[in-house]
Curated annotation (Swiss-Prot):
The lineage of its organism: Eukaryota, Metazoa, Chordata, Craniata, Vertebrata. It comes from the Eukaryota. Keywords: Metalloenzyme inhibitor, Metalloprotease inhibitor, Protease inhibitor. This is Angiotensin-converting enzyme inhibitor. Inhibits angiotensin-converting enzyme. It comes from Thunnus albacares (Yellowfin tuna). One of its GO terms (molecular function) is peptidase inhibitor activity.
């Protein structure tokens, strides 16, 4: 959610 590129 906080790191869109990581899928978070």
């Amino acid at each position: 959610p906080t790191h869109i590129k990581w899928g978070d």
